[in-house]
A protein has these predicted regions:
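Accessory terminal and edge-of-domain segments that mediate assembly/interaction
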Residues: 1-110, 116-263
Length: 263
């Protein structure tokens, strides 16, 4: 079946868009003057708790006025030029976050995601800056013509960011990954097929994030943190992370926040 969910000739208006929704009676009023032009999305469950633990934060939105995603949005007290929030679970939620923040005036987006590694070439704690993401998410096909890969723009910020993370002791790579939203259909056969494409891990938001940002015409970047390793054969057992993972994740989140506070 050929997927034709996006028609480049369709210039008609959305039935309702993120700005209309965020200002509707369905959602709380937001003081847009408090929303900075830069936003960092963490698609990892414990990131916001880590940020609040190690930084003095101020909440600028208790709930993002999204359609399906209601993340708390915070800034760091002494540097309110960038906001931080949970980016949602899965491509539909992340697209909602991006659309809503854009409607509130955000112009630059960074996504830090988490991948499950299924290759010998990536280890827990590695940070990868992929050139492109293999799309099996569905959302990306609504924001651009269907194609296998969604490009991850690689401006100078990646060289700078990689140098920064390496200086903080992180191992960095440029390996590509896949976005899939069917967690329990990541079979051994499917992951072997992904490996043959040169992919090293799987996550749930990247392709949708990249496609949404490109469609909206905003600056955007994405990097991914390896949270766990998948067994490479059915003879191995899947193990959820390691005892050291909490400290590894805390360091990554703090370094990721500081990168944007210093720039």
């Amino acid at each position: 079946m050929e997927i034709k969910w996006f028609n480049p000739e369709d210039k008609s208006k959305s039935v309702f868009d993120a700005k209309e929704h965020s200002k509707s009676s369905h959602r709380e009023n937001v003081d847009e003057s408090l929303v900075p032009k830069r936003a960092v999305l963490f698609c990892m469950g414990k990131a916001m708790g880590i940020i609040k633990k190690y930084f003095k934060t101020r909440t600028i939105m208790e709930k993002l006025p999204g359609f399906i995603t209601r993340s708390e949005v915070v800034v760091i007290e002494d540097n309110p030029t960038v906001c931080f929030l949970h980016g949602g679970y899965g491509a539909p939620q992340t697209a909602d976050v991006v659309e809503t923040l854009r409607a509130l005036g955000v112009e630059e987006f960074m996504l830090y995601g988490m991948i499950g590694g299924f290759s010998k070439d990536i280890q827990i704690g590695d940070v990868t800056f992929p050139n492109r993401v293999y799309a099996e998410d569905g959302v990306s096909f609504h924001y651009g013509e269907a194609k296998e890969y969604i490009e991850n723009p690689c401006p100078d910020i990646y060289s700078d960011m990689e140098e920064y993370f390496i200086s903080k002791g992180h191992n960095c790579t440029h390996d590509n990954m896949v976005t899939s939203v069917a967690v329990f259909r990541q079979t051994f056969e499917k992951e072997e097929a992904w490996r043959k494409k040169g992919l090293v891990g799987v996550e749930m938001e990247g392709a949708g994030f990249l496609a949404t940002c490109k469609f909206l015409g905003v600056k955007h970047y994405a990097a991914f943190f390896c949270s766990d390793k998948h067994p490479l054969s059915k003879d191995e057992k899947w193990v959820w992370r390691t005892e050291k993972f909490t400290k590894i994740q805390e360091k990554f989140v703090c370094d990721a926040v500081n990168y944007f506070l210093e720039r």
